[in-house]
């Protein structure tokens, strides 16, 4: 089993490559059904990946890395992606702005990946430098990823929570106010 496990950074980088490949395939696709299928795969992969980072990797980094701002920026970048993912999951390729939303999501994800993987100063480099047990984190990420994939298979994508958009959750592509910030009438 140890030979098949990946450290956390290797696992997250593999996820990055998979999503980049799906975006590349979308750019070359012409048929609506193919585009919709690719977007569903992209959204599923991103949902799982963001959940893994937010539940396991980012908290471990927040406690140990030198530049805490990088972790906070990552949460905000995820929240922006979650809005587009929620919108795309409720859309079809013929909808207005569909292709533009996929394009913007691709740009945002590629920027996020570049920041995380930046040599020497990105979050992954900082995690290594801080001495995090990346093998143990990798095992936790793999176990949680399997749970999430099984959950998605049986129940569909979960409702995603935003962290930096205080008091909001996303349903059908729109922020839903939790009642925390209500005005007295």
Q: At which residue positions do the language-model features occur?
A:
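Small-residue-biased structural context
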Residues: 1-185
């Amino acid at each position: 089993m140890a030979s098949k496990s990946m450290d956390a950074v290797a696992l997250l980088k593999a996820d990055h490559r998979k999503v980049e490949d799906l975006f590349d395939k979308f750019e070359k696709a012409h048929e609506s059904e193919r585009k919709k299928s690719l977007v569903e795969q992209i959204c599923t992969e991103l949902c799982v990946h963001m959940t893994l980072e937010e539940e396991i990797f980012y908290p471990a980094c927040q406690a140990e890395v030198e530049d805490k701002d990088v972790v906070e920026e990552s949460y905000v970048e995820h929240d922006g992606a979650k809005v587009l993912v929620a919108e795309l999951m409720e859309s079809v390729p013929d909808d207005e702005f569909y292709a533009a939303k996929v394009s913007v999501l691709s740009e945002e994800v590629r920027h996020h990946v570049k920041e995380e993987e930046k040599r020497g100063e990105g979050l992954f480099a900082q995690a290594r430098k801080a001495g995090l047990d990346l093998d143990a984190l990798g095992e936790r990420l793999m176990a949680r990823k399997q749970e999430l994939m099984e959950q998605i298979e049986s129940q569909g994508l979960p409702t995603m929570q935003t962290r930096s958009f205080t008091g909001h959750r996303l349903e059908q592509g729109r922020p839903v106010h939790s009642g925390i910030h209500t005005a007295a009438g």
